[in-house]
């Protein structure tokens, strides 16, 4: 039995949720998101809650039950508060600058890296901290992973781009034989 799927999602004020067949439609202001469940779960929208129930008792149905509940909750949280990821740049001469919809990175290569931001993502840079904001959890995480992937932190000096909460396990350098 899905412990996540059993929990109803409360609909906050200002968020309109409607059900069109097997598609949940979330609206807040001029922002609209759709979640297609492909008919794998039963959905009810009543009394300010979204309630998910499993279509069957097989393993696949129970997996969909918890998954779609979590995806719907991510849409609700994204439209109300949004998601944020922070990246930290460490290294001599490593810099970042936000220029409109492009993130310009100088990470020790012979050329600057210009990363074009996807739709719905905002970015801000303060000193060596890059803050990525957006309403879609998957896209925010994907952008953060791609930016980190340009120069992942190395274990000897810790230089590179890392998540703000990430801890780098350091290695000792070579020791000389005498």
UniProtKB/Swiss-Prot annotation:
Cross-referenced Gene3D superfamilies: Ribosomal protein L6, alpha-beta domain
InterPro entries assigned: Ribosomal_uL6-like, Ribosomal_uL6-like_a/b-dom_sf, Ribosomal_uL6_a/b-dom, Ribosomal_uL6_bac-type, Ribosomal_uL6_CS
GO biological process terms, semicolon-separated: cytoplasmic translation
Pfam families listed in its UniProt record: Ribosomal_L6
Record-level Gene Ontology MF annotations: rRNA binding; structural constituent of ribosome
Keywords: Ribonucleoprotein, Ribosomal protein, RNA-binding, rRNA-binding
One Gene Ontology term, aspect cellular component: cytosolic large ribosomal subunit
Known role: This protein binds to the 23S rRNA, and is important in its secondary structure. It is located near the subunit interface in the base of the L7/L12 stalk, and near the tRNA binding site of the peptidyltransferase center.
Family, similarity comment: Belongs to the universal ribosomal protein uL6 family.
PANTHER family, alphabetized: 60S/50S RIBOSOMAL PROTEIN L6/L9, LARGE RIBOSOMAL SUBUNIT PROTEIN UL6M
Subunit structure: Part of the 50S ribosomal subunit.
Protein name: Large ribosomal subunit protein uL6
Originating organism: Campylobacter fetus subsp. fetus (strain 82-40)
Taxonomic lineage of the native organism: Bacteria, Pseudomonadati, Campylobacterota, Epsilonproteobacteria, Campylobacterales
Gene responsible for this protein: rplF
């Amino acid at each position: 039995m899905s412990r996540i799927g059993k929990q109803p999602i409360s609909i906050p004020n200002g968020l309109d949720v409607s059900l069109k067949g097997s598609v949940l439609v979330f609206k807040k202001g001029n922002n609209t998101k759709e979640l297609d469940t492909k008919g794998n779960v039963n959905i009810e929208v009543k009394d300010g809650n979204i309630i998910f129930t499993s279509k069957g008792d097989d393993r696949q149905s129970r997996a969909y039950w918890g998954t779609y509940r979590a995806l719907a909750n991510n849409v609700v949280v994204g439209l109300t508060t949004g998601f944020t990821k922070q990246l930290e740049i460490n290294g001599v001469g490593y810099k970042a600058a936000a220029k409109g919809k492009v993130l310009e990175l100088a990470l020790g290569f012979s050329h600057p890296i210009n990363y074009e931001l996807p739709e719905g993502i905002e970015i801000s840079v303060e000193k060596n901290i890059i803050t990525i904001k957006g309403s879609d959890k998957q896209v925010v995480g994907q952008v953060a992973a791609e930016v980190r992937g340009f120069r992942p932190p190395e274990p000897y000096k810790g230089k590179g781009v890392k998540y703000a909460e990430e801890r780098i396990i350091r290695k000792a350098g070579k020791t000389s034989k005498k």
